[in-house]
Structure formats: C-alpha cells, structure tokens
C-alpha cells in the first residue's frame, strides 16, 4: 500500500528546492542541492504510485526505470512530457550532484526544472492542501 509519507516528503523536498533557489547563493553547489532535491521529488512520487498499484518498489534512483514501471504496471499517474523527456538528466542529478565534484547544474536548468516539476506535482494533484 502507498505510504502517504512519500508525498509529504516529496512536497517538503520541493519546498526546500524552491527556498534554496530563491534565497540561496547562486553558486554551483546551491544549484546542485536544488537539482538533487528535485530528482528526489520525482523519484518519491513515482515510487508512491508504484506502491499504490501493489508493485514492490526497487532500490533504485533510475527515473527512466521508475517511469517505465509506472507505465507498464498501470500506475494512476500522469507522466508529463518534460519528465518523460528528462529522465536521464534527472537520474544524473541524483548521483552526479553528490559524488562528482566537477559536475554543476546551471541556474537556468534548475529554474526550468522547478517550474516543470511543480507542473508534474499539480497535474497529479499533489499539494500541501491535500496532504
């Protein structure tokens, strides 16, 4: 069964990403924190929807794999075009922003991701008012 805490954690991470983007320094390390948080938002939402349809969620951060699993298992989730087109980038944000000291996410890419992931949350009715 879906653990609602996945959604609550995803919303908390989204809020953290927004706050870091708006009030943090515009340096590469801050943008990496924003990107990592956004990847986690998408991952948690996908995993919750998989659990909801009875799929055992694997220990993976691979957004492509999770999207594929949602589609193949009838998860009741809308995968936006931006999410579908950026699965590899989002997956890279999980590992590269944490372990590759030469990897940096540009501010404009973080801004675009903030907007598009908010759209993903909204279209799937994931909001603070609901949870």
What does each model-found stretch correspond to?
Residues 1-131:
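Terminal alpha-helical segments
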């Amino acid at each position: 069964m879906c653990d609602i805490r996945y959604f609550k954690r995803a919303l908390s991470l989204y809020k953290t990403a927004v706050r870091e983007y708006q009030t943090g320094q515009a340096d590469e390390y801050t943008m990496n924190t924003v990107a990592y948080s956004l990847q986690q938002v998408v991952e948690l939402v996908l995993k919750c929807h998989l659990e909801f349809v009875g799929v055992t969620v694997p220990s993976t951060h691979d957004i492509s794999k999770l999207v594929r699993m949602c589609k193949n298992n009838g998860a009741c989730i809308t995968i936006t075009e931006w999410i579908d087109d950026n699965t590899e980038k989002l997956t890279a944000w999980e590992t590269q922003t944490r372990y590759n000291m030469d990897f940096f996410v540009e501010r404009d890419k973080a801004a675009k991701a903030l907007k598009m992931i908010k759209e993903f949350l909204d279209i799937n009715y994931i909001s603070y008012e609901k949870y």
